[in-house]
Amino acid sequence: MTDQDLLAQIELLKKENAQLKEKLKSQDDEQLSLEEYSRYGRQMIVEGTGGVVGQLRLKKAKVLVVGAGGLGSPSLPYLVGAGVGTIGIVDNDIVDTSNLHRQTIHNTAKVGMLKCESAKQVLKDLNPHVNINTYPVRLGPENAFSIFADYDIVMDCTDTPLTRYLISDVAVNLGKTVVSASGLGTEGQLTILNFNNIGPCYRCFYPVSPNPYAVSSCQEGGVIGPCIGLVGTMMAVETLKIIMGVYNNENFEPFLLSYSGFPIQSLRRFKMRGRQSKCQTCGDAPVITKEAIESGIIDYNIFCGSRNYNVCAEGERLTAKEFDENYGPEFSGNNKVLLDVRPSHHFDISHFNNAVNIPLKELRDMDGDISTLQSRIPNINKNSEVVVLCRYGNDSQLATRMLKDEFGITNVKDVAGGFFKYIDDVDQSIPKY
């Protein structure tokens, strides 16, 4: 074969390739119905989104959302509204009244319903073209790989370090990109992990898990709905950008978005380091493999630690009814102290009139000095009878142990289940927040 023949064949192949591309493009165009053109037209005409090609990418995409709460709630409608073809929702929690100020995908009529099913109902009404899969299970090493396998992108809308490490580890092993965020109070953070399987992953950023006693939840620290809602919406934006091809291997740089809502709204973007060669999950010699995760060799509970609240003996605890019958909310007087160790802003919302409020952190900072404690509670001494309560009966156990072991007060009991258990079992007229 002469060089001229070879060049002719190359030109012929080029033409055939161009014709094939046109045919495939035509087939792709036919995959959008007239109704879909109308539905998505306003986003297809935005420059940089890829037009019809970008919309078809959305239609073919499969996104798994882990958590239908504060972050998942605002993310999901925008993903479904934009036309992401398949959405999976992992959440075994049920809708509670306390969720509704921020998890606006749910409503009062859905209280007691599984969050994933509640969300599915709303999303199917929003866009019937989207396939919604629900997984009413707790995500764990035993099921994460099978659930993740069918999806292109995983959105981490969870609220615990343990689950964040698990999601990132599994995603790296499966080559999945993760859009991860967190929110608490008036602040939030957002990042993209393992982009196109080139990193970095969550362990690259945080090789050591935070102290479990330093990690708060929205149940403990509170949350302003629009603040976490904004972070969830930004998660949806980043996910759409990944699907539409706005990011690629050449222009993507690891980042962390940090949002603060109060007192003045601010949004800052920080450049983050890339994949770490010594990372145990995505580094040069990974040890956190699929086999290690599924077999339990990687113990996330041990790695992340957990708060051990079970520090009181059975005789040191009172049920809510025992407290009411033997002590009661009016318990006070000489050598009698009803101590509430909730944060002061919790105490201000609702409390027993005779209770003295010293938050657990302030009690801990006293370092067992009885004279410092007496400056706050003049009638307390080592022979006093003390009953301790908190919101749920966890911090009160730690405080009971502290009062006995560090302050030397011998007669101390805590109320199991705390202030809220008393409301549930004894007096439901007290405000429960």
Curated annotation (Swiss-Prot):
Pathway: tRNA modification; 5-methoxycarbonylmethyl-2-thiouridine-tRNA biosynthesis. SUPFAM superfamilies: Activating enzymes of the ubiquitin-like proteins. PROSITE patterns: RHODANESE_3 (PS50206). This is Adenylyltransferase and sulfurtransferase UBA4. InterPro entries: MOCS3/Uba4 (IPR028885), Rhodanese-like_dom (IPR001763), Rhodanese-like_dom_sf (IPR036873), ThiF/MoeB/HesA (IPR045886), ThiF_NAD_FAD-bd (IPR000594), Ubiquitin-activating_enz (IPR035985). It comes from Candida glabrata (strain ATCC 2001 / BCRC 20586 / JCM 3761 / NBRC 0622 / NRRL Y-65 / CBS 138) (Yeast). Binds 1 zinc ion per subunit. Its cofactor is Zn(2+). Zn(2+) binds at C201, C204, C279, C282.
